[in-house]
Regions:
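Zn2+-dependent metallopeptidase catalytic core
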Residues: 6-22, 26-47, 53-112
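Active-site-proximal beta-strand/loop segments in catalytic clefts of secreted hydrolases
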Residues: 51, 129-130, 212-213
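Metzincin-family zinc-dependent endopeptidase catalytic domain
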Residues: 70-186, 190-194
Length: 244
């Protein structure tokens, strides 16, 4: 009885929050995230709720502590602010009221991630590996349709990545790369050996984020732009500029 009562109260709070948010934002709150457009200044943001599952791998010396969990999530926020937020600026044209108001203006894009024990858009499994061993590695991945992510404890620090068997190498933060997938750009642009060179038209763009580098590209916003155009009929959103 108590649980159902508490759940009903929480649902009422959620409904009120949604009502207040809808007054300020144009929203597309789907299973992959809450995409918002600020009605006043045109700023675009993507809110992601992550439900973490912390796992100790065989080579980790100790299990996750609460301090380490909080530090990891704090570094997630730091990485997003340093490498994604306010680096991409969109704009809009078209015949809608919104497009008329913001035609040609810079519209900032940002990502916000909050951790939650309920209503998680994404289930995020983080494996603790041996951070002191340079050879300790676990392949990170996402399953888009299931909104499932696997990371490891080294994904918040830069590591050398090389393009196939060539000598082209760059430093990359794994989390930064995985966020590109999470916002809807599903292709990996790198290749693992010389035989794979033709698998993507962007395999030679080694400095790009979805390859082995850290630089953003306008093409990574395709899914976001498709959602924005559906949210505001009569509008044509596009990437205006990208800070590398």
């Amino acid at each position: 009885m108590g649980d159902s009562h508490d759940e009903a109260i929480q649902q009422a709070y959620d409904a009120y929050d949604d009502l207040m948010l809808d007054k300020r934002y144009i929203r597309d709150n789907d299973a992959w995230g809450d995409l918002r457009i600020d009605r006043e200044n045109g700023a675009i943001s993507l809110l992601l709720r992550w439900k973490y599952n912390w796992i100790k791998r065989w080579d980790a010396k100790t299990d996750w502590t609460d301090l380490e969990k909080n530090a990891f999530h704090g570094k997630v926020i730091f990485v997003i602010n340093q490498t994604w937020n306010n680096k991409i600026f969109l704009s809009v044209s078209g015949k809608s009221e919104f497009a008329s108001k913001f035609n040609g203006k810079d519209l900032s894009f940002s990502i916000e991630i909050i951790q939650t024990d309920r209503h998680g858009y994404w289930d995020v499994v983080v494996f603790k590996i041996d951070n002191d061993d340079p050879n300790s590695f676990r392949q990170s991945s996402i399953v888009w349709n299931s909104r499932y992510v696997e990371l490891d404890s080294k994904d918040i620090v830069a590591a050398a990545k090389c393009l196939g068997s060539s000598k082209v190498c760059h430093e990359q933060i794994g989390l930064f790369h995985e966020l590109g997938h999470i916002i809807g750009y599903l292709a990996d642009e790198y290749y693992s050996d010389d035989a794979d060179k033709a698998t993507t038209p962007f395999s030679g763009d080694a400095s790009a984020l979805m390859n082995i580098g850290m630089e953003l590209r306008s093409r990574y916003m395709r899914n976001v732009i498709e959602r924005l155009n559906r949210m505001v009929p009569g509008s044509n959103f596009f990437v205006k500029s990208v800070k590398k």
